[in-house]
Amino acid sequence: RIRADEEKIHRNFLLPLLRSSIVQHDISNMHVGTLIPHFKKGDFDKLYIRFPQKKEIQQAIGDFYLAISKKITLNRKLNETLEGMARALFQSWFVDFDPVKAKLAAVRHGRDPERACMAALSGKLRILPGKPKPDTLDVQLPTAEALDAAIAALDSLSPAQQNSLAETARHFPENFAESELGLIPEGWSSVALYDTAEFVNGAAFKSADFTDDEGALPIIKIAELKQGLSDQTKFTKNEVKERHRINDGDLLYSWSGSPGTSLEVFKWFGGEGWLNQHIFKINTTTQEQSVLVWLILKHLKPELIRIAENKQTTGLGHVTVADMKRLCVAWPDGAALEAFGRIAIPIYEQHSSHILEINSLAELRDTLLPKLLSGELSVGEASAIAEATADKPETMEAATLS
């Protein structure tokens, strides 16, 4: 833990000062550690830092840095909420199959299946969670009394809301069918994870491919997926097959590395680049498909980690194409997928816009900080740039949504 000597430096200024590219570069050049670089308490005696002496300037720079950092934190929290909403929808529709359970219960109890499904979709009908199984399905289905109360509660909704729910409800079947996954909605399919999209592995690069020449594109490895581009990122101008090119909005899956921290699905918003091996680029034909595959990989993460851990050597594990062909998921018919997209795509797009804003704010903060420290830019000028760049309406819209 580091505490500022407030007789010499303002407490809000210490963090941005230590995080500045100048200080970080000086720390890196000290070559502390061998296999695992580290910076000890005693090393601070060798670290010399230049900074403005006036406390009011220090405070202004610190406040500016923290204000942008708080916006970044807010967007991350909003994205946690949005992802939670999307995953809850996925769990209900594609794992527990709540809309189908509601319709089946209504048929058995002589109630209106569509109205029962509407009640489930609106959250007014509570259904026991869990995958449907022949020996437990009856217990999971709502009672006649629960159906009656939930259907009656639909009257509290506006006609527009009821029409929207009815449009969605009509795309769900009234019963289940047996499959290799167990019970899934009638008309749906059991599909191998590998067949839910086109998974294209990245290219293999050698040290001879790297260059700092102008016009070179970054090579995107797992480190870049987690932290963005850095001074450790490698670049190349070599000819690379077009299928390995990635751009903003592409969906990527890291299938090799430390299972607990590396196996993850990512949305890429770091600009144009070349994809490194051990990462899949996920190609889809529709946005509905992209959102569903994103959520499937989120949902299957624990299972994929378990698979990788069983093959773990020297701390690393991986998921193979063969594994993805063995692992199956329930895939909806076209009408249900379209209905899902009408709800999930706006959430997905808002989530993506927050990632873009996070990246933009972080780049702005880290670009302006050295200029503030050197006096090249005043805090007032930096704040004006930040105000002009920040996308406030989207942030407020997301805050309202959450």
Where would I find each of the regions flagged by the language model?
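Sequence-specific dsDNA recognition surfaces
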Residues: 1, 174-179, 194-209, 218-251
